[in-house]
Amino acid sequence: MHFNELRISQDNRFLIIDVSVDNQDYFEDVLLDSIVIDTQDTFVMNGPSDNPLYIYNVEDAYDLTYSLPEQCNCNPVRVEEDESYCFTYGTQQMKNVRLELNIQDLKVSPCSTMFFVYVKSKGTPSTDTPCGFDKDQILGTVINLQPIYKQTLKYLKEVECDCNIPKGFIDMILKLKAIELCVRTGNYPQAIKYWNKFFIKNNCKSPTSNCGCYG
């Protein structure tokens, strides 16, 4: 399995999850089973937790209505009435899922939430599956980078104005890299600690600049 897309939309309204079963012959009998979302408040090692933010069972979704292919990126598709869900079907049934979850409905902040997205599969890969490729669960982590991106633009304007790199810019990059390294190495508890310490209170604030010529 792999994520085709895992991000928060630019308008901060939606958590977008697009996932597929790998397109190799040895995964012919493997289907997507469920998507479970934890946050920094519910995360546990070897998750998902017993009280996740959100659970989505793929099989249950196949009572949904159909829509025209041009209404969604999938081809062909079927979606729920509110067009939050998009699926392929037929020979690829339950091998591709796209969710666009309204973050307001999830009752969490788009700026201060670290999402842990688990995708589970069902079915058995063939016996010739390479070692390490037969996992039945993957985990993706996502935060809202839009506020950080906007703050970066402000800092870059300061660089243009003063020809000096602001200390706040360096500080922000180091903090973000610390979280990224923790996630990449699987040290999620430490990533959560850094997220809560460095970003959770400030990520929703409007960016500021000390550059007088840009205001």
From Swiss-Prot:
Cell location: Virion
Principal location class: virion
One cellular component term from this protein's GO annotations in UniProt: virus tail
Superkingdom of the organism of origin: Viruses
Annotated keywords: Viral tail protein, Virion
Keyword Cell membrane applies: no
Record function comment: Forms the tail hub together with tail hub protein B (THB).
Subunit organization: Heterotrimer with THB. The heterotrimers further assemble as 12 docking hubs that anchor the trimeric tail fibers.
Protein name: Tail hub protein A
The organism of origin for this protein: Bacteroides phage crAss001 (Bacteroides phage PhiCrAss001)
Lineage, opening ranks: Viruses, Duplodnaviria, Heunggongvirae, Uroviricota, Caudoviricetes
